[in-house]
Amino acid sequence: MKSKLKLHGFNNLTKTLSFNIYDICYAETPEDLQAYVQYIDEEYDAERLTQILTDVVDIIGANILNIARQDYDPQGASVTILISEQPVTPTDSQIEESPGPLPDTILAHLDKSHITVHTYPEIHPVDGIATFRVDIDVSTCGVISPLKALNYLIHQFDSDIVTVDYRVRGFTRDIEGRKHFIDHEINSIQNYLSDDTREAYQMTDVNVYQENLFHTKMLLKDFELENYLFGDATRTLSTEQREQVTERLKHEMLEIFYARNMPR
């Protein structure tokens, strides 16, 4: 086993995991679109998001200092949790490059650290497409990696598209005074995902190793139209309409995945 790095004082590295999760839906009528927004707004209100983030705190081994949460009118919610590190020695499972736990395997230590989540429901004014975006940031200062929370969070939301960024900033010193700008090995965010997640998504990496900057984009491979319909659309669409809606939804997902408008 690789020996642990002996530090001089506190580990001053800041590790930040930022990711955006998109859930896509089609509703046939304006009323159904509004009903979807209301449904998703209630499903992921501030109370539910607080519970999810509290689980994240448990996963990364942190101590909650303060929670601030807010539901917004007409829709949306946000939660911020301040966390602090306890003086413990991390286990190998906390720092090694491997997937974190799934929602049903959750088992409750970071100065200047926080977790935030914001939700953004959105409706296309013409095409009947609604998107629900969740932005989550997990920032830790110390030895614990926020990447351990990634696997759990992807399984907590209906994730059609996921964009993940991970960066390490600052430096810490060993007992001989030498600077270390990262304290763990990593070559891809994908290594922190479980096998079933890697199999379910088309993924692409853009990594800048010399800058300790890692980026992964994920697009769900399997497309089952029934999983994307809401309201009357689940029973009233003709075969031709279903083909048209399928094309619209796939086009919408590709535009979000590639972050650019694409010709139809």
Curated annotation (Swiss-Prot):
Its EC number is 4.1.1.50. The keyword Protein transport does not apply. It is an enzyme of class 4 (lyase). GO terms for molecular function: adenosylmethionine decarboxylase activity. One of its GO terms (biological process) is spermidine biosynthetic process. InterPro entries: AdoMetDC_fam_prok, S-AdoMet_deCO2ase_bac, S-AdoMet_deCO2ase_core. Pathway: Amine and polyamine biosynthesis; S-adenosylmethioninamine biosynthesis; S-adenosylmethioninamine from S-adenosyl-L-methionine: step 1/1. It catalyses: S-adenosyl-L-methionine + H(+) = S-adenosyl 3-(methylsulfanyl)propylamine + CO2. Its cofactor is pyruvate. Is synthesized initially as an inactive proenzyme. Formation of the active enzyme involves a self-maturation process in which the active site pyruvoyl group is generated from an internal serine residue via an autocatalytic post-translational modification. Two non-identical subunits are generated from the proenzyme in this reaction, and the pyruvate is formed at the N-terminus of the alpha chain, which is derived from the carboxyl end of the proenzyme. The record marks 112-113 as: Cleavage (non-hydrolytic). GO terms for cellular component: cytosol. The modification Pyruvic acid (Ser) is found at residue 113. Binds 1 pyruvoyl group covalently per subunit. The keyword Lyase applies. Keywords: Autocatalytic cleavage, Decarboxylase, Lyase, Polyamine biosynthesis, Pyruvate, S-adenosyl-L-methionine, Schiff base, Spermidine biosynthesis, Zymogen. It comes from the Bacteria. The active site is at residues 113, 118, 141. Heterooctamer of four alpha and four beta chains arranged as a tetramer of alpha/beta heterodimers. Belongs to the prokaryotic AdoMetDC family. Type 2 subfamily. Catalyzes the decarboxylation of S-adenosylmethionine to S-adenosylmethioninamine (dcAdoMet), the propylamine donor required for the synthesis of the polyamines spermine and spermidine from the diamine putrescine. This is S-adenosylmethionine decarboxylase proenzyme. It comes from Pseudomonas aeruginosa (strain UCBPP-PA14).
